[in-house]
Amino acid sequence: MKSRLPLPPPSALLPSFKGGLHDRRTATAIGRLLGVAMLVCMVTGVLSHYLQHPPSWLADDLPARPSWGYRLNQGLHVGVGIAAIPLLFGKLWTVYPKLFAWPALKSARHALERLSVAVLVAGAVFELLTGLLNTVQWYPWPFSFVPVHFAVGWLLTGALLLHLAVKWPDIKAYWWRRSAATRALPAEPENTPDRRSLLTGLAVAVGAVTVTTVGQSLTPLKDLDLLAPRHPDHGPLGLPVNRTAAAAGTTRVDTAAWRLTVRGPRPYELTLDELAALPQYEVELPIACVEGWSKNAHWTGVRIKDLTERAGAPGAALRVVSLEQHGAYRVMDMGRSYARDPLTLLALRLNGQVLTPDHGYPARIIAPNRPGVLQTKWVTRLEVR
């Protein structure tokens, strides 16, 4: 009878990791930068969500100023999110040997740490990947992007807080490098990059992806946005377009038959010529889209507050209805804070020219501090609420 050879212990089957680039100090150095990036993305993401989908109790009190607020918010959200991608790769590369640690679970605290790491990694990869694909408007999944992205963001925040609580002793020890023990790095094998090279490489990667994408919202760098899906100058009348008239089914608007219908205590209708004969105002406001691109433009049109006042409801909240028959935003609610703001227009002209079909001809909404999807195009009706 043949004797069987004894199986090696699990630890003997695990890979051996050497060098100073998988140590706690390096992980903490990268982790604090990634943590700040995630915090910025979470805060700006929540602000963006509630500006785009406000609860009923908040809708009338959303701030219309500063007029560039949403542009800054969404530029930070997308720009920092893209910059976080190389940081996440660097963090995962530094800590991945921990995945092979044995025994897999040592204690209840260790189990919590493992659970938080699993959710944290999965959530971070999901948020950054889906967010990046959203910037190019590619959605190769069966679910709705906005609610799922928002929900996973909260899940990721919870996992991050749990992870920080579990790892707080290490963070406290290595963040400020208080002792010789925490300042010391493990010996590094020959011909391997050192910690400084790793951090320098990450800094270069973050700088490169930022400089080549942030120009879609930061005008001085617009000619360097080689990797951005939008250039702020490319589009009809010098302004990009997300949803075209062809996609909305509004390429052929019968100008002679078109009417602006305003419903309120004193309802009325206006032809395009009658609307153009009303006092016109010019404002400079940005279009800022959730995908991250934005640009200032000059808009000319009639103040919304003048139209609601004529209907007997000055400064009232509105429901704006588009000629578009299909689309998530063909009907848009506008709270009182926007409707009574003097910068909010029913615009007829863009940069001195009559609106093109892609920009919402014959009339569109433009309002300060408001997501681009809520700047309704091809407007046909205003309903006082």
Predicted regions and their residues:
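Membrane-embedded alpha-helical bundles that constitute the cytochrome b-like, heme-associated redox core
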Residues: 1-232, 249, 262, 361
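Structured, non-membrane catalytic/scaffold regions adjacent to prosthetic-group chemistry
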Residues: 214-385
